[in-house]
């Protein structure tokens, strides 16, 4: 449990997790997360909460693909890749996982690239329940924590969003 706590805190300081919890993300704690390696498609994606000026709750966003690989329940590491999660192509810098039974939460610090020279660093949490068809009750929450190279491609630094899958299932898919 201490290894997991250290891993999660390396990924996301508690203040960011607390902010995402205030926005409404579900956090599944525990040291026995299910093996979630796979590719998942969230669509439609619906905005549940936001601190971004001008956002309208209920708006939809582009379909999101999430690829989770190399899960290790000894050190609670996992790799996270995204398409349209934040930008065109998203890659985790450091990531951790928690959960028990079929419930899990992935914590990531992700580099979102808009162009080869424009990128931002986001804190992101993905949460849900693993099923045979994908991730039930899929949610993802994000905060821009470093927009120094992001220009105007991303939401302002310090702001965040909570998004869910509109039909409550991010379906398993084979193509990333």
How would you name each of these model-derived features?
Residues 36, 62-64, 122-124:
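Residues that flank catalytic or metal-binding motifs in active/ligand-binding sites
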Residues 41-43, 109, 129, 141-142:
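Residue-level recognition of well-ordered beta-strand positions that form the cores
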Residues 42, 46-92:
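N-terminal glycine/threonine-rich, aromatic-flanked beta-hairpin/loop signature
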Residues 47-58, 85-89, 112-120, 144-155:
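Short, cysteine-centered beta-strand-loop-beta hairpins and adjacent loop/turn segments enriched
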Residues 70-136:
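Contiguous, well-ordered beta-strand patches that form the walls/edges
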């Amino acid at each position: 449990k201490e290894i997991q706590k250290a891993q999660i805190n390396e990924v996301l300081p508690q203040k960011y997790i607390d902010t995402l919890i205030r926005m409404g993300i579900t956090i599944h704690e525990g040291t026995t997360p299910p093996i979630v390696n796979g590719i998942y498609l969230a669509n439609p994606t619906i905005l549940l909460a936001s601190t971004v000026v001008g956002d309208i709750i209920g708006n939809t966003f582009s379909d999101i693909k999430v690829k989770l690989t190399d899960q290790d329940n000894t050190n609670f590491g996992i790799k996270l890749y995204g398409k349209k999660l934040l930008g065109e192509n998203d890659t985790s810098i450091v990531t951790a996982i928690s959960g028990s039974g079929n419930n899990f939460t992935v914590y990531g610090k992700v580099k979102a690239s808009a162009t080869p020279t424009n990128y931002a660093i986001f804190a992101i949490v993905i949460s849900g329940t693993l099923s045979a068809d994908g991730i039930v009750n899929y949610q993802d929450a994000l905060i821009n924590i470093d927009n120094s190279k992001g220009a105007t491609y991303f939401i302002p630094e310090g702001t965040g969003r909570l998004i869910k899958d509109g039909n409550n299932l991010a379906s398993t898919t084979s193509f990333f």
